[in-house]
Amino acid sequence: AWEHRDPAEVFAAARDQLGLPFFIKPCNAGSSYGIHCIEGEEGFAQALADAFYHDGKGKVILEKAIEGFEIGCAVMGNEEVIAGSVDEIEIAGSFFDYEGKYEMKDAAIYCPARIDEELFAAARDMAKRAYRAMNCSGMTRVDMFVTPSRTIIFNELNTIPGFTATSRYPSMMKEIGIPFPQLIDDLVDLALQRKAGGDGRAEQ
């Protein structure tokens, strides 16, 4: 993560360490606000300023571009952890941006993901391990990439995922037999259990 610095200095360091293209995004934001795919120095300063603008805490993160496609897995629980189904994002552009997420422009979501059983199981296992490693509780959506060599790469956690009846998180839970009303009840129960019993976070 980077704090405010000279754009030319930041670009040079990112190019040397990450190669091109790379991504710049706020450390504290959602809905793909402030995320940019950087393919050269032109426009980088403006993209950097936009990422800082959407962060709120004055920090951004620069990431190496990963060749492959994105998958996600819904995870729920305190001490005991449940992994939902795995979904897959198909996009026409360089990343799943705001228009793709909320208008489904040039994007499609498949639940369950169009991957084989081995990758499916590995993705659910990685999601649960990430959930425990980050000491999560309640709910989280774990986002990952699948590379052409079938390697699963952890991307990030979304601790407040979209939560309409047709959003990704509820859809993945519905796929394993937890309908939306029950999901809400279960999450409320988890919150009450945590409040009554102390921290109640997933053990590593």
Where are these regions (language model features)?
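Flexible, glycine/proline-enriched loop segments at strand-loop-helix junctions
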Residues: 1-4, 32-38
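A short helix/loop element that forms part of the nucleotide-sugar donor recognition site in Leloir-type
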Residues: 6-14
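Phosphate-binding site of ATP-dependent enzymes
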Residues: 36-125, 146, 151-153
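ATP-grasp fold ATP-binding core
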Residues: 14-33, 56-67
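Active-site glycine- and acidic-residue-rich loops that bind
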Residues: 2-7, 69-71
